[in-house]
Amino acid sequence: MSEKASDRWHGIERPYSAADAARLRGSVHIEYSLARLGAEKFWRQLHSEPVVAGLGCMTGNQAIQTVQAGLNAIYCSGWQVAGDANTAGEVYPDQSLYPVDSVPKMVERINNALLRTDQIHHMDGKKEIDWLVPIIADAEAGFGGNLNAFELTKALIRAGAAGVHFEDQLSSAKKCGHLGGKVLVSTGEAINKLVAARLAADVLDVPTVIIARTDADAADLLLSDHDPRDARFLTGQRSSEGFFYVKAGIEQAIDRGLSYAPYADLIWCETSKPDMAEARRFAAAIHAKYPGKLLAYNCSPSFNWKAKLDAAAMKQWREELAALGYRFQFITLAGWHALNLSMFELASAYRENGMLGYSQLQQREFAQEGAGYRAVKHQSFVGTAYFDAIQTAISAGSHSTGAMAGSTETEQFTSTVKSGPKRVVA
C-alpha cells in the first residue's frame, strides 16, 4: 500500500495512512508468497475473465479435483467448516460456534494439497495446469470486534488466502444467511470491520481482495439505532432481547452495499432465492453510484434450484449474472453435498451388491481418466513416486525400499491416457 493510489486501489478509501500501516508492520519483512500470488491472480481474473466460478471445498482432495476439472478459484466456506471440518472436531450449525482458527487451518490444508500436487507434476515435467488457484475464505462476522477481525484476517493471509469476506451480522448471534433470527450491526460497525481487514492486509503487505457481504435483504433485527444511516429502516419496535426491528429487503441491502463500496473490492448481497430481477436491481443501484464496482453472488445450495428455474435458465444463470457485474460466483456448500451424496450412493450400492457396487464406482473413475481424473491411481495421486524420488536423491540411487515399484497399482492400473485437458491460469 502506497500513498499514491494505483489502479488496484482505485475507489478504495482508507481512514489511515501508508505510514500508519508501515509503523505497525515491524522491522522484519515477512513475505506471504501464497497469499500474494493468490490475491494478484484473483484480481487479474476478475478483470480479464467473464466470470470467476468457484466451488466450496472442505478437503484438500476436493480442491485438487476442482482445479483438475478446470475451475479457477476455490471457496472456503464457514458453513462447511462448521458442519464437518473444524479444529474442534465437532459438527456445528453455521452460527460461529467453531474455534476461530478453523477456517485458516482449512485454507492451509487446501494450499498444502495444491502445493503437493504441483510438486508431483513439476517433478514429472507436467506444466499444463496452474494448481495454485486463489482461495477465497469466509471470515463470517469477524468472531468479535475490530481487533478480532484484524487478527482473523492476518491468520487467513498467513494461511495463504487470496481473498476474505466479512458479513454485517452481529458476531455473537451470527446465523447462516438462509436461517432466521439474523441481527445486523450498525452500518458504521460493519465498515470498521472492513477497515480492520484492509489494515491487516496492508500491515502484512499483501493486496488481499476484501469482499463485503450484507445480510440486510433478510435480516430484520439491528443491534443499535445510533447510526443515522440505519434510521430510515427502523420500525420503532424492539425485540424481547432489546434489538431494534428494521425493514428487511432489497432497499436495505442496497443501502448497505453503497455504504460498504468504498471499503471493499467486491460487494455481495446474500439473497433468499435465485432472482435475476432482484440481482439486476441491486447491481444497477450499486453501479449508478460506483460504476464498474465488482459484485459477488452466492449460488447457494439452500435454494431449491429446480423449483425456482427451468433447465435453460439454470444453464444461462452464470453468464447472465456475469453480464450484470457479478464477476465472482460460487456454490458455498458444494463440497459438503458432494461428499455426503457420493458416500451415501456408494454405501447403498455396497449394501445391495457387495464388491460389484464398489467396482462400479471404480469403473466410473477409470471412465473419467480421459477428462483428466487421476485419483483412481491413489498411490500416485498422493505422491508415492515423489517421495521415492526424495529417497533416491538422499541415497544417491542406492536403496531397495522404493514404494511404487512392485505396487499393485503399477501392476494392475495401467492406462493409455496421458493427461487431461489443458487449463492454464494466468
Task: Identify the residue ranges that each predicted region occupies.
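C-terminal functional modules
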Residues: Q363-A426
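A contiguous, mid-protein "functional segment" used to position or interact
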Residues: A338-R374
